[in-house]
Amino acid sequence: MALELGWGGYWAWDPVENASLIPWLISTAALHTLIVQERRNKLHRVNVALMCLTTISAFFATYLVRSGVVQSVHAFGDGSVGTPLTVFVLGGLLISFWAAFAVPARGRELAGIVSREGFLVMVCWLLLALSVIILVGTMWPVISLLWTPEPHGLDANFYNRVCVPLGMLIMLLLMVCPWLRWDGGLRDAPRFWLALGAFVASGAAFFFLGYRQPVALLA
């Protein structure tokens, strides 16, 4: 089954474009956890693993484009490079696990969830969850061959139903994060509640004026 890009929209979850999105999501997660490492001296192993995964996912994107394992209007090349890239990606994963566990554990334990570092870690996990969902969805034509002779792909509706809510949750967490202290609690509670009230009021006003798309209202 060929999953093709719809040229009438700005994003239609084409497999090759999905492959380029995955490294971006992982590297974005790494940037946020690196902030925790710089400010709080924590998550050293996590950051090593995320930086390694960013590089590996970039080569995996090359594998999708050049191997032809998943059909796309953006893919090119034949399958001759598939095996070397597969070996490289699997070898890179093994090296990444070794490198992550070779880093000595140091620093204090993470603060509670309702803290700046807690929210940044949640953002990291959500970004990684998005990466896994998009990876599985992109490779679904190959995975489906385990139980059916004909490959079956997932259309854009699947990604929109699953990824858009997670993306909105990430946006909400990042909106609240600057108002939190590193050790927990609000930095300036009166201003936070004032800003939250203004946000809810403006969102309600736009909603009644006819702007009904949740992502646009959240932005």
What annotation goes with each model-predicted range?
Residues 3, 32, 36-39, 180-183:
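Structural motif corresponding to the C-terminal cap of alpha-helices
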Residues 1-4, 43-45, 115-118:
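Short, motif-level signal for alpha-helix interfacial/capping segments enriched in acidic residues
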Residues 20-35, 52, 62-64, 68, ...:
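Transmembrane alpha-helix detector for multi-pass membrane proteins
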Residues 8-9, 61, 68, 137, ...:
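Glycine-centered flexibility sites
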Residues 15-22, 51-53, 71-219:
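Contiguous transmembrane helix-bundle modules in multi-pass membrane proteins
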Residues 1-18, 67-75:
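Interfacial helix-loop-helix junctions of multi-pass membrane proteins
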Residues 1, 57-65, 132-141:
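C-terminal TM-helix exit segments that contain a strictly Trp-centered aromatic cap at the helix terminus
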Residues 29-30, 35-58, 89-96:
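Phosphate/diphosphate-binding loops
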